[in-house]
């Protein structure tokens, strides 16, 4: 187990730190007394704010040995703070690979003494990943009370999940308690065969002016059952408006299960006082396995969730609820 810190404060801020990782020898995957392998890289680790921190990663992160523990993880955390802002943090990964599950955070929720602590803001953060392969799952996550003007870019990225691997899904999620506005997820030359593929920008009160762009991407499921879930939603909120989803050459492999594929620029979390308007899906090319069906492809959908299950449906044609949502 290794933890690397560019800057840390137990009672204050961690700002303007840089962590450069260019390993000459990758980290070894070993059978140890703990029964799992877990390593973490931190740009800024603090309690009252973490801003302007950068993590640069080049070369392979691990050896090619595969480990199978559900606790395995390689955590890349640009900013960790219990309160205050987590703004202008960056993660760059180039020409690298990992056989551990990779979790990348520009800002993250922290749990202490059964309490959740969120940064007050996660704004203007960036993740750029190029020429990278994860032989387990790959997840990029931003969590804060407010998240705006964040960008996540993939170019030539693979999330290769073997059917025998313990898999938690491959996801890109920007999640805010209040508002998530003006965020961009741009995916190019990407493939994932995780059981749970989720690409979401979401907030409770407002998700607006967000954009997801998908080019030359292959999504499927590695398991023998060919059962999984795929969700692509640019603005999931009680108030979702002016969000854009652009899809050019999306290839969908076999999904045998029902209620598996949901694609929309906007989604609302129920019908009570929710609104979805001025959202647009631009669709140029889909290539779909012959037995695969897209459950919902729409300008907006409704997401229902309780303690037992979750489901989705097309938003009803009610001008007070949904208007000017377009599928082009």
Positions of predicted regions on the chain:
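Surface-exposed loop/turn motifs in large extracellular/passenger domains
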Residues: 1-3, 8-40, 44-328
């Amino acid at each position: 187990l290794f933890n690397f810190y560019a800057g840390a404060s137990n009672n204050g801020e961690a700002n303007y730190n840089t962590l450069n990782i260019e390993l000459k020898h990758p980290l070894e995957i070993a059978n140890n007394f703990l029964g799992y392998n877990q390593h973490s890289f931190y740009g800024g680790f603090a309690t009252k704010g973490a801003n302007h921190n950068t993590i640069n990663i080049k070369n392979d992160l691990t050896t090619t040995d595969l480990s199978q523990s559900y606790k395995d993880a390689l955590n890349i955390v640009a900013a960790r703070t219990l309160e205050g802002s987590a703004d202008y943090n960056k993660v760059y990964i180039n020409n690298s690979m990992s056989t551990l599950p990779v979790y990348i955070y520009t800002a993250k929720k922290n749990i202490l003494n059964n309490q959740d602590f969120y940064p007050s803001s996660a704004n203007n953060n960036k993740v750029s990943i190029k020429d990278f392969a994860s032989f387990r799952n790959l997840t990029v996550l931003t969590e804060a009370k407010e998240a705006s003007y964040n960008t996540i870019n993939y170019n030539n990225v693979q999330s290769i999940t073997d059917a025998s691997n313990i898999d938690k899904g491959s996801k890109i999620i920007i999640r805010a308690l209040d508002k998530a506005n003006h965020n961009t997820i741009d995916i190019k030359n990407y493939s994932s065969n995780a059981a749970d593929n989720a690409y979401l920008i979401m907030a409770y009160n407002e998700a607006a002016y967000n954009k997801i762009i998908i080019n030359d991407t292959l999504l499927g499921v590695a398991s023998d059952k060919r059962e999984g879930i795929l969700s692509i939603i640019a603005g999931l909120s009680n108030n979702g408006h002016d969000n854009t989803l652009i899809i050019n050459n999306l290839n969908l492999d076999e999904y045998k299960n029902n209620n598996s594929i949901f694609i929309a620029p906007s989604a609302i979390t129920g019908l009570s006082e929710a609104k979805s308007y001025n959202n647009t899906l631009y669709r140029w090319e889909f290539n779909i396995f012959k037995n695969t069906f897209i459950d919902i492809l729409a300008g907006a959908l409704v997401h229902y969730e309780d303690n037992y299950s979750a489901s989705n449906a097309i938003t009803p044609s009610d001008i007070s609820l949904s208007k000017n949502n377009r599928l082009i």
